[in-house]
Amino acid sequence: MASGREIKSKIKSVQNTRKVTRALEMVSASKIRKAQEQMKISRPYAQAMKQMIGHLAQANTDYLHPFLIAHKQVKRIGYIVISSDRGLAGGLNNNLFRKILGEMRQWQDKGVEVDIVTIGQKASVFFRRIKVNILGSVTHLGDTPRLEQLIGVIKVMLDAYTEEKLDRVYLVYNRFINTMVQKASFDQLLPLLAAKDKVAHHDWDYLYEPDAATVLEHVMTRYIESLVYQAMLENIASEHAARMVAMKAASDNANKLIGTLQLVYNKARQAAITQEISEIVGGAAAV
């Protein structure tokens, strides 16, 4: 059995760790509220854009934007992967990466090659380590990212699709469901899909000023950017929720461990006292 001093040292070490996990839990609880507000503010715009683009995909026009055209064969696909910059978020990032690898293997089994761009330090490090072809990367965007910071990596994928270097583009991120649930999501970005709402079967006629090509070029690009930005906000909220839950679990485990160590310490102290008493009694009897 370890000595009382060693056990006391272990208890002190676990208590110090508990202070850190409690602090991180409280910080994440505070940040998640702000992240949820940002996410909710952005959602209506993204949803309205999605509905409008779905209608444009069915509109009667002489000009068909490249983002609406499905390539005949799928030989190469691209993923925009969003992760966190920091760890201590439970299995949030690893679960996402595991699902991406499963999807990638399915495509590769069909002879389809895969390119990615990464948003977030964890994704960048992970995919560089396993030697996936990375077309672009951006990291350390913080808790309040700006759209301008994402435009570069988004443009890489849009240009590759327009030039037919990629045949499909997917957006991969953690969708925020609630504080306890975050879901790995795979959304098809390109080619754009037609609307599936109750008016999807209508034929839509739009008047474009100055012309269809100019309007659609701007609208389509803004739409893709809004989807990626919304996914980024969802992932940030998911990160803080996962970290809060993980740190609470760590704090609870620390409490249990401290309780167990305290019992061991009490038993060791009791055994030491009992031994001292026995030695005193034995010495007195010998006299």
Swiss-Prot record:
Keywords: ATP synthesis, Cell inner membrane, Cell membrane, CF(1), Hydrogen ion transport, Ion transport, Membrane, Transport
CDD domains according to UniProt: F1-ATPase_gamma (cd12151)
Membrane topology listed for this record: Peripheral membrane protein
GO biological process: proton motive force-driven plasma membrane ATP synthesis
InterPro entries per the UniProt record, alphabetical: ATP_synth_F1_ATPase_gsu, ATP_synth_F1_gsu, ATP_synth_F1_gsu_CS
GO-annotated cellular components: plasma membrane; proton-transporting ATP synthase complex
Function: Produces ATP from ADP in the presence of a proton gradient across the membrane. The gamma chain is believed to be important in regulating ATPase activity and the flow of protons through the CF(0) complex.
Protein name in the entry: ATP synthase gamma chain
Organism name: Xylella fastidiosa (strain M12)
